[in-house]
A protein has these predicted regions:
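C-terminal "post-core" interaction segments
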Residues: 1-130
């Protein structure tokens, strides 16, 4: 049995949250970063007359042991740090020195602009060039 580490952020949602909850509840891994998006209800959008639309939920997921539903709340990490610092926190916790951790983070760290729906740019991690 080996513990594994999962990095998460407020952009982790939907199926990723199912995975996060399983990791957390099984005790097989450790979650680092920010609380996830809280997006676990699923359904579809319907266009209505006069420019209106609605979302029709057709299902929800929940923790079968506790009946807990994380819609709108998200799955909290075991170690709460800003998402940009999650890898550094994992490396520190497994005994990697600060200088080596910074080098590793620089090698696999990345930025890739994305946009929030209706909002401004957001910086998320992406592979470093080269």
């Amino acid at each position: 049995n080996t513990t594994f580490y999962v990095l998460q952020s407020g952009f982790s949602g939907s199926a990723a949250e199912h995975f996060l909850l399983e990791v957390k509840m099984s005790g097989r891994g450790k979650l680092y970063g920010e609380t996830s998006a809280g997006a676990n209800h699923f359904g579809y959008g319907v266009d209505l007359p006069n420019g209106f639309s609605t979302f029709i939920p057709v299902g929800r997921t929940f923790d079968p042991k506790t009946n807990w539903d994380w819609e709108g709340k998200g799955v909290a990490p075991d170690v709460s740090v800003p998402a940009a610092d999650a890898l550094l926190a994992v490396l520190k916790d497994v005994g990697v020195g600060a200088d080596d951790a910074a080098k590793l983070n620089a090698q696999v760290g990345f930025t890739m602009p994305q946009r929030r729906p209706g909002g401004g740019p957001v910086v998320v991690r992406a592979p470093a060039p080269g």
